[in-house]
Amino acid sequence: MIGIYIAALVLGYLFGSIPFGLILTRIAGTEDLRSIGSGNIGATNVLRTGRKGLAAATLLLDALKGTAAVLIAAGFGGAEAAMLAALGAFLGHLFPVWLKFKGGKGVAVYIGVLLGLFWPAALVFCVLWLATAYTTRYSSLSALVAAFITPIFLWWFGHPTMASLFAVLTLLLFWMHRDNIKRLQSGTESRIGEKK
């Protein structure tokens, strides 16, 4: 079983480390995504290029790589392997070896692995994100609010192990958004659709 668990973790990491935002913007001929806006490779920064279609595609593919890793691991290793694949995918997106361990902030992958493990929680995350984004126009705040609620939701609905996993992922997500949190506190955070 140890071998299966390691395989699930590695599989998740490899899936998660695929930098779709960077790949899509290069194919589209835009400037290097890491040199504009926040320098992040995720969908929010892709949106700052003005290419809404590319941003949507990045969001979708970043989420689906997490979902795919979870479902594949579940197929060969069960629920425990699926959760390890979720962890691996999240870490792979945050710290991809191909980009010198400088990746995205993990929101789309967070949604994707959540979708693969327990889809009602992913639905709740999306509703919370959309509601917060609609009222505040802050992508970062929307993600932080939704992620904060996710482990609580999982625990409440009888998934303590999964809740523990997502508590860890949420802490990592908050850490990756530490600069956004500072800007939110100072009132200098960019709103959705704004270019930096």
Curated annotation (Swiss-Prot):
Annotated localization: Cell inner membrane
Catalytic activity: an acyl phosphate + sn-glycerol 3-phosphate = a 1-acyl-sn-glycero-3-phosphate + phosphate
Top class in the EC scheme: transferase
GO molecular function terms attached to this record: acyl-phosphate glycerol-3-phosphate acyltransferase activity
Membrane topology: Multi-pass membrane protein
One family name in Pfam for this protein: G3P_acyltransf
The UniProt record lists the keyword Zinc-finger: no
GO biological process: one example: phospholipid biosynthetic process
Cellular component, GO annotation: plasma membrane
Superkingdom field: Bacteria
Annotated InterPro entries: G3P_acylTferase_PlsY
Pathway annotation from the record: Lipid metabolism; phospholipid metabolism
EC number assigned by the record: 2.3.1.275
Keyword Transmembrane helix annotated: yes
Principal subcellular localisation of the protein: membrane
Keywords: Cell inner membrane, Cell membrane, Lipid biosynthesis, Lipid metabolism, Membrane, Phospholipid biosynthesis, Phospholipid metabolism, Transferase, Transmembrane, Transmembrane helix
Bilayer-spanning residue ranges: 4-24, 70-90, 111-131, 152-172
Assembly notes: Probably interacts with PlsX.
Function (record text): Catalyzes the transfer of an acyl group from acyl-phosphate (acyl-PO(4)) to glycerol-3-phosphate (G3P) to form lysophosphatidic acid (LPA). This enzyme utilizes acyl-phosphate as fatty acyl donor, but not acyl-CoA or acyl-ACP.
Family per similarity comment: Belongs to the PlsY family.
The name this protein goes by in its record: Glycerol-3-phosphate acyltransferase
Taxonomic lineage of the native organism: Bacteria, Pseudomonadati, Pseudomonadota, Alphaproteobacteria, Hyphomicrobiales
